[in-house]
């Protein structure tokens, strides 16, 4: 399957802050290394770290979103962009993808520039800014840009990685800290969920609230 994909690069998106530097840098580099091993990409973490350090000296005094890519030849490319509110601005709508994803697809477990499963999901519901993905077993996995966390009476839960989702760095940190726990989330569970969050290491916590009588969730706070 991997050989059938168009040429792709490994990808990490990092938050850089003037006072704190790169958020969860070690976790990003560890995930990058795992993906390089899986896809057999040459990777020098030393060179990647040096490149990130050099870039940080030019980032100025405002938050930046850093895009790090590694080619199949091991070439490192960095881009910095001033952090804005992204596609999930206050009032943005998130729906449910019309078709399931295949949890056996290895690209769901690794962050790369190959995003066909995500673009297809978005194109299936073009009226929304983002959509929740679900697998062949009717289990919720993530959105196209973030991990999902549901607020339940028993605490905050997020789907296990085995369901077919990216092991987000912020998600991993929250699990380690005991702030969230893994539990299956079915489509039925989602239908009845009023309050939930989308999380990633660049945006932090994005809070959503369900609209009355519709399977649509609106962003009510961002970051």
Please give the residue ranges for each predicted region:
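Helix-start/capping segments and mature chain N-termini
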Residues: 1-65, 69-223
């Amino acid at each position: 399957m991997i050989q059938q994909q168009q040429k792709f690069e490994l990808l990490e998106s990092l938050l850089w802050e003037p006072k704190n530097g790169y958020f969860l840098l070690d976790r990003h580099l560890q995930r990058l290394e795992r993906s390089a091993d899986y896809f057999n990409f040459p990777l020098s973490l030393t060179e990647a770290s040096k490149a990130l350090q050099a870039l940080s000296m030019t980032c100025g005094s405002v938050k930046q979103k850093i895009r790090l890519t590694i080619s199949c030849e091991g070439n490192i490319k960095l881009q910095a962009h001033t952090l804005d509110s992204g596609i999930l601005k206050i009032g943005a709508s998130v729906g449910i993808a019309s078709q399931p994803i295949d949890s056996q697809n290895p690209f769901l477990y690794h962050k790369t520039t190959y995003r066909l499963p995500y673009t297809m999901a978005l194109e299936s519901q073009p009226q929304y800014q983002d959509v929740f993905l679900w697998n062949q077993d009717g289990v919720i996995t993530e959105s196209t840009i973030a991990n999902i966390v549901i607020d339940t009476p028993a605490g905050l839960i997020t789907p296990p990685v085995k369901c077919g989702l990216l092991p987000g760095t912020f998600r991993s940190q929250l699990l380690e800290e005991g702030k969230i726990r893994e539990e299956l989330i079915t489509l039925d569970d989602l239908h009845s969920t009023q309050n939930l969050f989308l999380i990633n290491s660049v945006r932090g916590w994005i809070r959503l609230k369900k609209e009355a009588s519709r399977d649509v969730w609106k962003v009510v706070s961002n970051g």
